[in-house]
C-alpha cells in the first residue's frame, strides 16, 4: 500500500513460503539436506548480488533475505574450514557470512538504504566442538521420507528416538566427568525445556541512512520491535498494527521505558510421535526483563518454574524461585497478561499435518 517494491529470498519451507506470499518477487532456495541445500558459498551469494544489481529493483524497495548458513547441522565450505576463520564450525560460518555481508554492502547505496541484520534465534555451541545428538545411522533413518504417518511409522520413529536418547544419555554421563554444568548445557537442543540467553539473545544491527552515529545500545529490546522501527525510520504511516514499538528514539539518544519480552521454546519430533494427541504449542513459556528471567510450563503454573537473576547470575546457573516469591508473583503477572492477550489456539492434528510438521522439524534440526 506504500508503493514499495517487495522482494525476498527464503528457504523452501512451508512457513517461509506462506508469510512471503504477497511479495512482488520471491526466490525460493533449496534446503532439503546438508548435501543438496543451497547456501551463500555455492550459489545464493551470487544470486543476491545479481538481484541488488538488477534493473528490476525499482525504488523504493525492501529486500528480505533469510539465510540458513549458520544453522545446525553446521556445514562449512572448504575455503572457510580453516583455523584462521575461527575455532569451531559455528565461528567459521560466522566468518563466511561476514565476508558475504561485506560484498552485499558494496552493492548498496548506504546514503538512501537502511540495512537491518538480526536472527530469529540463537544456538547452542557444543563445548567439545561436536554435537552428541548427531548419530549418523539413526539420523539417516529418521530423515528417510515417508508417504504417510502410519501406526508402524510412528512406532519406528519412537524406537529410533529412544535409541538416540539412550546414546545421548551415555555420552552425557561420560562428559559430565570433565565438563562443568554450564559447559554441559551447550549440548542442549532448542526444543528442550529451557530458554537460556544463548538461544534468545540475538544480534540486532541497524545501519545506513537515518542512523547518524555508531554506538551500542544496552537496553532490552525485542524482535517484534524491528518492523515498527523500520516503518518509523522510512517515514511511513505509524498506524500499522504491530505487537512491537519503534526503537528510533533509542537510536536518536532518547529514553524509552523498558518493556518485557515474551519467549517460548520450540517443539520437537517427540511431541508429535510420542503422544496420542500431538500438540504444536510449546511446552515452556516465559518472560524476560533486564533484571530477571521467568519460565514455567505452559499448562501448569507450578511445573518447571525457574527464576534467574540476570544481574548477579548472567549465566543463569542458579534457580532462585524459592528465594524470591514476590518477584515470581510479579513476573507471573506479566506473563499471564501476555497469554491473556494472545488469541492463538491449536486444533486437532491430522496425519497429514503431522507428516508436514515432521518434515519441517527434521529440516530445521528440531529433533
Model regions and ranges:
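Catalytic domains that recognize anionic headgroups
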Residues: 1-367
Amino acid at each position: 500500500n506504500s508503493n514499495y517494491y517487495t522482494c525476498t529470498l527464503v528457504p523452501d519451507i512451508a512457513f517461509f513460503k506462506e508469510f512471503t506470499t504477497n511479495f512482488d518477487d520471491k526466490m525460493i532456495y533449496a534446503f532439503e539436506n546438508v548435501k543438496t541445500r543451497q547456501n551463500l558459498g555455492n550459489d545464493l551469494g551470487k544470486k543476491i548480488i545479481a538481484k541488488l544489481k538488477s534493473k528490476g529493483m525499482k525504488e523504493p524497495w525492501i529486500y528480505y533475505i533469510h539465510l540458513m548458513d549458520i544453522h545446525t547441522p553446521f556445514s562449512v565450505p572448504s575455503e572457510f574450514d580453516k583455523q584462521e576463520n575461527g575455532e569451531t564450525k559455528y565461528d567459521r560460518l560466522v566468518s563466511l557470512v561476514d565476508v558475504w555481508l561485506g560484498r552485499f554492502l558494496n552493492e548498496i547505496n548506504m546514503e538512501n538504504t537502511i540495512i537491518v541484520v538480526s536472527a530469529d534465534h540463537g544456538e547452542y555451541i557444543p563445548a567439545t566442538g561436536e554435537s552428541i545428538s548427531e548419530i549418523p545411522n539413526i539420523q539417516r533413518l529418521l530423515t528417510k521420507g515417508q508417504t504417510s504417518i502410519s501406526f508402524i511409522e510412528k512406532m519406528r520413529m519412537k524406537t529410533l528416538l529412544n535409541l538416540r536418547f539412550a546414546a545421548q544419555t551415555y555420552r552425557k554421563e561420560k562428559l559430565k566427568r570433565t565438563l562443568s554444568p554450564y559447559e554441559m548445557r551447550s549440548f542442549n537442543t532448542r526444543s528442550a525445556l529451557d530458554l537460556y540467553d544463548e538461544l534468545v539473545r540475538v544480534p540486532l544491527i541497524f545501519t545506513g541512512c537515518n542512523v547518524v552515529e555508531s554506538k551500542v545500545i544496552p537496553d532490552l529490546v525485542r524482535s517484534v520491535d524491528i518492523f515498527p522501527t523500520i516503518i518509523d525510520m522510512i517515514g511511513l504511516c505509524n498506524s500499522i498494527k504491530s505487537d512491537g514499538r519503534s526503537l528510533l528514539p533509542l537510536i536518536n539518544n532518547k529514553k524509552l521505558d523498558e518493556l518485557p519480552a515474551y519467549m517460548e521454546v520450540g517443539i520437537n519430533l517427540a511431541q508429535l510421535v510420542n503422544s496420542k494427541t500431538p500438540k504444536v504449542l510449546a511446552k515452556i513459556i516465559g518472560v524476560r526483563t533486564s533484571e530477571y528471567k521467568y519460565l514455567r510450563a505452559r499448562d501448569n503454573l507450578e511445573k518447571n518454574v525457574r527464576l534467574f537473576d540476570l544481574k548477579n547470575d548472567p549465566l543463569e546457573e542458579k534457580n532462585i524461585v524459592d528465594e524470591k516469591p514476590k518477584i515470581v508473583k510479579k513476573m507471573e503477572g506479566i506473563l499471564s497478561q501476555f497469554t491473556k492477550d494472545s488469541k492463538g489456539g491449536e486444533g486437532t492434528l491430522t496425519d497429514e499435518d503431522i507428516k508436514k510438521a515432521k518434515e519441517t522439524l527434521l529440516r530445521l534440526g528440531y529433533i
